[in-house]
């Protein structure tokens, strides 16, 4: 059985880890980095770039460079947060036929899980290159406050990427695993404050030693799935754009290229201000008008940045209060505070967390890597490689159904340990009603319409009876991934219907299968493209070498030889401009055959000179550095060995 890898699929960056021995190891990608930007770009020559390569070209290709797509996953197009996002990003967010938020690139509509699958494929390949074996199973992390649709969509992304997702695990819980696995001595209650690129979570977790086993029990979780580093960046971008408008009278908002440069500069300035008190944003030739080019030069102090993002930091503290209350603990009961997510490197965030909890956060947890490491540990637990860990997570939001009068009736309260199930008996609202619609909801509001609709289904063929008489038992079952299965049963007839909740949004199995096939087709295309490039390079090398041989041969080549070789060279050059690999290979073979006699003649002549003339071997390199000489010297070197 292969390794189960752990993947932190982040809004801004992603990370992959695997358990080696008893330690989780973060795997470096092909570029040598331990994290990979969650950015995907589609170029004009139909190439798909993922990670650093996509980030590098974002300034010149903003409309086709997708970032922070995780904020759209499992969301409806009409959601307020999606409408806000449309104004923030240079790429096109569009409405899918089922009402979901999708993206459109070069006229093609794509679902967020499809985009995220590209990042997951890169993580999968990174792990495979390191392990030297195929990887098919993974544990993928999600924000603790993700709802059912978002969890299901993340699982779909894994499937499209060719991964069997063994478990969806909450990011703060994963970080707690990474932190607490090797800690000995007594029970502890920790707070994991996770402020990432696009989402915020707070989890209160109890770590206990029970019969020699590490037990991680989540007491409560809360958060905001639209609060993260991207919002901090946006606050600074808006400030810089406003400053530029005040100085030059030009609004950069309508210029995607300028805004992309501004985004990169803002992110860089934000990072610099975590260690410096002041930085300068300097963007020459940001735009131009009739008076000439314009340059953006703005000094930003740490104090200024803090004033711009103060409300965002404050926003993160409300869920902390709720989580503590739900867990039934006070700040004084918290043993350790763990910071996760790149945005927690900001001194203002650290200061606010310290003041809120009354203690300094731990510094021995890497905020960028802890989540992936925890996912790898959970993978090892599932594969049986780690046996002394028990993880008890919770469902972040209340689950229930809509009942008469548009009220939400809860069946499973938030912060219930999962897996779990609950059932309740309901009845009909009208006389002789023969069917009931079970409308499944997730959220904390009493009014059904104010909660997230996870989907609905009908239980039919109920025998006619006065209202209130039929006994309809509705059962909710949440699996260890936090994904809901719902059943309804008429107790009189025993008729039952069970479904795994698939929201009216979300991808159907057929759509996912099609996306898996598309991904596989793209993999074949990529392989063919790579082979074509290699063949072209081979052709280019042969053309160059043959021309040098002709040049060196001079009068030693007959006119017929020169004509035949030149014709074959021209034909190969022409073939290499096209995309027919077989044709290029045929022309390579033809040129090799027609030029071989001349190459052999030259080689024999040089060998004769080398043997006949005293000291000729020392002078030989001066004859030129063509391919024939190179081959001659290689043979000579081999002889010397």
Curated annotation (Swiss-Prot):
SUPFAM superfamilies: Actin-like ATPase domain (SSF53067), Heat shock protein 70kD (HSP70), C-terminal subdomain (SSF100934), Heat shock protein 70kD (HSP70), peptide-binding domain (SSF100920). The modification Phosphothreonine is found at residue 199. Keywords: ATP-binding, Chaperone, Nucleotide-binding, Phosphoprotein, Stress response. GO terms for molecular function: ATP binding; ATP-dependent protein folding chaperone; unfolded protein binding. CDD domains: ASKHA_NBD_HSP70_DnaK-like (cd10234). Pfam families: HSP70 (PF00012). Residues 626-641 have a biased composition (Acidic residues). It comes from the Bacteria. The keyword Ribosomal protein does not apply. The keyword ATP-binding applies. Residues 602-641 are annotated as: Disordered. Induction: By stress conditions e.g. heat shock. Residues 604-625 have a biased composition (Low complexity). Acts as a chaperone. Belongs to the heat shock protein 70 family. This is Chaperone protein DnaK.
